[in-house]
UniProtKB/Swiss-Prot annotation:
GO terms for molecular function: ATP binding; DNA replication origin binding. It holds the Pfam family ORC5_C. The gene is ORC5. Component of the origin recognition complex (ORC) composed of at least ORC1, ORC2, ORC3, ORC4, ORC5 and ORC6. Interacts with ORC6. Component of a cullin-RING ligase (CRL)-like complex composed of at least the cullin RTT101, a linker protein MMS1, and the potential substrate receptor ORC5. Interacts with RTT101 and MMS1. InterPro entries: AAA_16, ORC5, ORC5_C, ORC5_lid, P-loop_NTPase. The lineage of its organism: Eukaryota, Fungi, Dikarya, Ascomycota, Saccharomycotina. This is Origin recognition complex subunit 5.
């Protein structure tokens, strides 16, 4: 059966590959198909365009990242397949099977077999495509789990009228390399270059920006009456090109990041439009040049009073502020100390019993280094060292009166409770600290190594916001 190949910008080769692999005939359609490409390369978009262009192909979409682990994914497969078939063939009497009973892969095979048997009255065989969008984002994914999925078709009856076909979209090539011997058909989606990114953004966003209410409102305020839709489109296209040119070195070819900047900057760009410069791209750019000098994102404290950062009204309105909790700030400070201060100094700096030891043994030899450690890559450290230093520097304010019996019962150190690990997870999500593992991170595992991912200037700003003098901890080491 012939299939329709949709037109997708800069993805002609990929759509032709999909047309070769995906069809309504189960005899020529492979049981497993992989689409590999990094975020923002158009895997999901191209696949959706392909199925929209071929309505005779029946597909079920699942996103494993939303299901977290393998057991909910198994249950979601049973539930969605059963519902899809009932929707496609409402006249066939069927028995409902409880998807919550699917707790193991072999139970999924049993459930699918029972579901497919009910459709043996169909005249022709048909394909049901199960699309697992972002399969390698599953939290507890291991090498054995993917093997069970790609072998699932071998456990189902060959003469079944319903043939399930799996399509996986994945980000990392390192995951696929483990299964290279299985010879699974794979379609690669390379990154877009800067010209392709600009073209895609203009094609996808111009219409939306033209219809934005802030542009229409500005046109009415400035009493601009002699402007056509083509000229509105030129204004939007010029703005998108300026965003790409100004921030490409910051975002790379990440379409999602550029889209966020477009949404953030567009209302402010529109506010600079006047009757005199709307037809003059250069004049409009000069009037709004401050928008393209920075992302207007800064890390600062939202506090009031003497410690608040004083800014003028215009700068305050044109900026976003992100505030970390006190625990997150001290964890980040402790991470920097762990990455740039050698472990042999920990006892002399943080121990409360160093005063018992006399002489050089109390503090060790602290020789000024030839190269400032801040100019080097951060060192890796274990979670135990991070928590120990965090406990030593985190201020504990007792609620009881000093010297009272209640004060004796209070803890003198901050405990590594669930709140601490929640803040640690937040810092990892924000990429402020990094690990040697890309996913499935066990925050309590001694095998995981950590490192700080922010420069000295940011750490100094954060430490000043909590009145912590981090420079004292690097005396005679940092220049």
């Amino acid at each position: 059966m012939n299939v329709t190949t949709p037109e997708v910008a800069f993805r002609e080769y990929q759509t032709n590959c999909l047309a070769s692999y995906i069809s309504a005939d189960p005899d020529i359609t492979p049981s497993n198909l992989i689409l590999q490409g990094y975020s923002g390369t158009g895997k999901t978009y191209t696949l959706k365009k392909y199925f929209n262009a071929n309505p005779n192909l029946h597909a079920v979409w699942l996103e494993p990242v939303e299901l977290v682990s393998w057991k909910p994914l198994l249950q979601a497969i049973a539930r969605t397949v059963q519902y899809k078939l009932k929707t496609l063939y409402p006249n066939i009497p069927t028995t409902d099977y409880d998807p919550l009973q699917v707790e193991e892969p072999f139970l999924l095979v049993k459930t699918l077999h029972n579901i497919f048997v009910q459709y043996e009255s169909l005249q022709e065989k048909t394909c049901l495509f199960l699309i697992l969008d972002g399969f390698d984002s599953l939290q507890d994914l291991d090498a054995a789990l993917f093997n069970k999925y790609i072998k699932l078709n071998e456990l189902l009856p060959k003469d079944s009228k319903i043939n399930i076909k799996f399509i996986y979209t994945m980000l990392e090539t390192s995951f696929l390399q483990r299964y290279s011997t299985h010879c699974i058909p794979t379609v690669m989606f390379p990154r877009y270059n800067v010209d392709e990114v600009s073209t895609i953004l203009v094609m996808s966003r111009c219409g939306e920006l033209m219809e934005d209410s802030c542009l229409r409102k500005r046109i009415i305020e400035e009493q601009i009456t002699d402007c056509t839709d083509d000229q509105f489109q030129n204004v939007a296209a010029n703005f998108i090109h300026l965003i790409v040119q100004a921030f490409h070195s910051y975002t790379g070819n990440d379409i999602f990041a550029l889209n966020d900047l477009i949404d953030f900057k567009w209302p402010k760009y529109v506010s600079r439009i006047t009757k005199e410069n709307i037809f003059e791209p250069l004049a409009l750019y000069k009037s709004a040049i401050k928008l393209f000098l920075s992302t207007d994102d800064n890390l600062s404290e939202n506090g009031q009073g003497e410690s608040a950062i004083t800014t003028n009204r215009d700068d305050l309105e044109n900026s976003q502020t992100y505030d970390l909790s006190i625990i997150s700030k001290y964890l980040l400070i402790a991470s920097y100390i762990c990455s740039y201060l050698e472990p042999r100094y920990d006892a002399s700096i943080f121990s409360r019993k160093t005063r018992i030891i006399q002489g050089r043994a109390a503090y060790g030899r602290r020789k000024k280094k030839e190269v400032n450690p801040r100019y080097l890559q951060p060192s890796l450290f274990a979670i135990e060292r991070l928590l120990a230093i965090f406990q030593a520097i985190f201020p504990i304010q007792g609620k009881a009166e000093s010297g009272s019996l209640s004060a004796l019962r209070e803890e003198s150190l901050m405990k590594a409770n669930i709140e601490v690990f929640q803040n640690l997870s937040e810092l990892h999500t924000l990429k402020l600290i990094a690990t040697t593992m890309n996913k499935n991170i066990d925050y309590l595992s001694p095998k995981v190594r950590w490192k700080v991912n922010v420069p000295w200037e940011i750490i100094k700003e954060i430490s000043e916001s909590v009145h912590f003098n981090i420079s004292d901890y690097f005396s005679d080491i940092h220049e």
